From Swiss-Prot:
It is an enzyme of class 1 (oxidoreductase). It catalyses: 2 iodide + L-tyrosine + 2 NADP(+) = 3,5-diiodo-L-tyrosine + 2 NADPH + H(+); iodide + L-tyrosine + NADP(+) = 3-iodo-L-tyrosine + NADPH; 3-iodo-L-tyrosine + iodide + NADP(+) = 3,5-diiodo-L-tyrosine + NADPH + H(+); L-tyrosine + chloride + NADP(+) = 3-chloro-L-tyrosine + NADPH. Its EC number is 1.21.1.1. CDD domains: iodotyrosine_dehalogenase. Homodimer. Belongs to the nitroreductase family. The lineage of its organism: Eukaryota, Metazoa, Chordata, Craniata, Vertebrata. The gene is Iyd. Catalyzes the dehalogenation of halotyrosines such as 3-bromo-L-tyrosine, 3-chloro-L-tyrosine, 3-iodo-L-tyrosine and 3,5-diiodo-L-tyrosine. During thyroid hormone biosynthesis, facilitates iodide salvage by catalysing the oxidative NADPH-dependent deiodination of the halogenated by-products of thyroid hormone production, monoiodotyrosine (L-MIT) and diiodotyrosine (L-DIT). The scavanged iodide can then reenter the hormone-producing pathways. Acts more efficiently on 3-iodo-L-tyrosine than 3,5-diiodo-L-tyrosine. SUPFAM superfamilies: FMN-dependent nitroreductase-like. Keywords: Cell membrane, Cytoplasmic vesicle, Flavoprotein, FMN, Membrane, NADP, Oxidoreductase, Transmembrane, Transmembrane helix. One of its GO terms (biological process) is thyroid hormone metabolic process. This is Iodotyrosine deiodinase 1. 3,5-diiodo-L-tyrosine binds at residues 126, 153, 157, 178.
Length: 285
């Protein structure tokens, strides 16, 4: 019968202790990694990377494939004018800031129509245009939206977001109180459509729907700045389903961004932040 010598026993004990210590360290690292992960709004998860199985949509496919191609009309500017226009556009957008103090002064509805039409020119996967812009002007509806968002945002700040995220936001002096949702004359809620419907009523895949809608949001921000209006990009975490029901939107639409829109209130302030320089954001190969 094999007998363990004292030396062998010591070696076995050391190995056992080493295994347990490494297991504990690995567990702690996983816990720390989980704590460091930013909280994700489950309602916004985009499953298009899994290539949704599309139902039989032959009628839709045939009609799309037969779209006529026309000659592209392009205006080419002299180089000097190109430089001037690009510089002027940059200077315009460089003044864009996130404004949390918004006046209740009404804005022309025609301007809102135009900026949303501009956002609707965004490119999209397979030209599916997977966006819905909900414009809210009614004071009672705006207040209901505020109540839902503030209720969830308080939980986000206290529990879901984590200490690091909350600390990073302190320089912006922001919290779960969103007075601008009442004072702004217009709220624009941008929904992504996770799928659409073909002419035969079957589901139609909306490829890269979140990326497409995000591009549209960027164009909308630029259009608002060009029109002389201000906003703050609001992402109402965990509020999507309730706001979708409140606004009567279908289940295949998911809330991506909310923009309160108007003029800045008198005495509005912004944090004195600096943007990264060109050499910090661009790499030329």
């Amino acid at each position: 019968m094999f007998l363990l010598t004292p030396v062998l026993v010591a070696v076995v004990c050391i190995l056992v202790i080493w295994v347990f210590k490494n297991a504990d360290r690995s567990l702690e690292e996983k816990k720390e990694e989980a704590r460091a992960q930013p909280w994700v709004d489950e309602d916004l998860k985009d499953n298009t990377e899994h290539l949704q199985v599309e139902e039989d949509t032959e009628e839709w496919q045939e009609s799309e494939e037969s779209v006529e191609h026309i000659l592209f009309s392009h205006t080419r500017y002299p180089e000097q004018e190109m430089r001037m226009r690009s510089q002027e556009f940059y200077e315009l957008l460089s003044k864009r800031r996130s404004i949390r103090f918004i006046s209740s002064e009404p804005v022309p509805m025609e301007v809102i129509d135009n900026v949303i039409k501009a956002a609707g020119t965004a490119p999209s996967g397979a030209h599916t245009e997977p966006w819905t812009f909900v414009v809210v002007k009614d004071p009672d509806m705006k207040h209901k939206i505020r109540e839902i968002i503030e209720e969830e945002e308080e939980i986000n700040y206290m529990k879901r977001m984590g200490k690091r995220w909350v600390t990073d936001l302190k320089k912006l002096r922001t919290n779960w109180i969103k007075e601008y949702l009442d004072t702004a004359p217009v709220l624009i809620l941008i929904f992504k459509q996770v799928h659409g419907f073909a002419v035969n009523g079957k589901k139609k895949v909306h490829y890269y729907n979140e990326i497409s809608v995000s591009i549209a949001c960027g164009i909308l921000l630029a259009a608002l700045q060009n029109a002389g209006l201000v906003t703050v990009t609001t992402t109402p975490l965990n509020c999507g389903p309730r706001l979708r029901v409140l606004l009567g939107r279908p289940s295949h639409e998911k809330l991506l961004v909310l923009l309160p829109v108007g003029y800045p209130s008198r005495g509005a302030t912004v944090p004195d932040l600096k943007r990264k320089t060109l050499d910090q954001i661009m790499v030329t190969v």
